[in-house]
């Protein structure tokens, strides 16, 4: 109708918060596991081949484990980016997860030359000069994984949900 109205769309204080006495820790764990499992199963419904982005961290390892359990058919494709020049690498953890879950593991090494070669592409895809620390690795992994799958499940955003980034 061409008119503008100013009103509050969302207020987090309108939602009931559970007190610690309303749900036991074991019930909360059971509920979270059930929600997580349902979410993964929903994401696996696809008419194209899919896989999991696997860093070796807790979030992507859990997603991969639940996906393997739910998929059952053929080995699940997992994709990891390896950055050799970092002081810390989670490669050994992604290797352990893949071995334990018997996934079809794909690892892609990101060199300094590739960082330089694809830097402009990454900035273009970000649509901003505000670079995210994982942007280059995520770009490199996605670029290479596209040869195998059309969809990747990832743990991106899980730290915000699960209380990560404590430091």
Protein language model regions, located:
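Non-catalytic substrate-recognition/targeting regions of SAM-dependent transferases
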Residues: 1-12
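ATP-dependent adenylate-handling active sites, centered on carboxylate activation for C-N bond formation
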Residues: 14-167
């Amino acid at each position: 109708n061409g008119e503008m109205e100013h009103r509050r769309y969302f207020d987090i204080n309108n939602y009931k918060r559970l007190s610690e006495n309303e749900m036991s820790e074991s019930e909360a764990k059971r509920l979270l596991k059930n929600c997580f499992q349902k979410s993964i199963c929903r994401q696996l419904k696809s008419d194209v081949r899919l896989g999991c982005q696997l860093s070796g961290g807790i979030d992507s390892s859990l997603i991969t484990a639940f996906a393997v359990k739910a998929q059952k058919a053929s080995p699940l494709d997992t994709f990891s980016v390896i950055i050799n020049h970092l002081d810390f690498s989670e490669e050994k953890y992604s290797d352990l997860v893949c071995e334990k879950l018997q996934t079809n593991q794909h690892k892609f090494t990101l060199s300094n030359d590739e960082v330089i070669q694809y830097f402009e592409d990454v900035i273009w895809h970000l649509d901003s000069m505000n670079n995210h620390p994982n942007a280059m690795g995520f770009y490199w992994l996605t670029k290479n994984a596209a040869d195998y799958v059309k969809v990747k499940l990832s743990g991106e955003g899980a730290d915000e949900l699960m209380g990560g980034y404590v430091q």
